[in-house]
Every structure is written in C-alpha cells, then in structure tokens.
Amino acid sequence: MPGHEITQQLDVVYGSTVRSKHVGRDLLAGLKNIVGGELTAYTELLEESRQEAMQRMIAKAQQLGANAIVGIRFSTSNIAQGASELFVYGTAVIVQPNAPKLPDPFNP
C-alpha cells in the first residue's frame, strides 16, 4: 500500500457466498446467447455476490483488529447443479502511514 507500512500480519481472512441461478434469468441468458450481448442478469448476480463475500471478509478482518487486507483474490466454483460459490480471501494486516521523508512545504 503506497504511503503505508505493514506493521503486523494477523491471519488469512475470507468471505464466501453461494448463489443459485434463477430460471427466468437462465431463459433470458439463453436468448442473449443466441443474439449476443452482455448477460446483465448474471453480471448483476455476480456483483451482488462479490459485495456480499467482501463484506463477510472485511467483518472477519475487523474482528481480528485489522485496518487493511492485502493480497485479495477471488475464486468461483460450481458446487451443485445450478449453484455457484464466490470465494474471496486475503491477509488481514495492520498498517501505519510512513513518516514523510521530506518536510511538506505546504504544511509548515
């Protein structure tokens, strides 16, 4: 993290969510597949899943006393017919701002 120093590594933290596909979304996605274009229903579902998994990971990091998470990675997997897991993980750390190397001429 630019301008910060990691002072303590706490632990690996993660968050996940499992979502199932919606029959209506599948039908519309099938039509889009034929004519081409973005599958917006799935894009929205994936964005919701990312947000939920991230919030769960952040909550775990905060419970450890972390003020940052580094090395964040996302992974997806199919776990059952029509259901997928989105998994996010990273390392919970404590960071502190670096001391400026030169005096700031704008803040005497």
UniProtKB/Swiss-Prot annotation:
Cross-referenced Pfam families? YbjQ_1 (PF01906)
**What does the record list as coiled-coil region(s)?**
none
The record's listing under InterPro entries reads: UPF0145_dom_sf, UPF0145_YbjQ-like
Q: Which cysteines are joined by disulfide bonds?
A: none
Q: Which family is this protein grouped under?
A: Belongs to the UPF0145 family.
Protein name in UniProt:
UPF0145 protein ACIAD2946
Specify the species: Acinetobacter baylyi (strain ATCC 33305 / BD413 / ADP1)
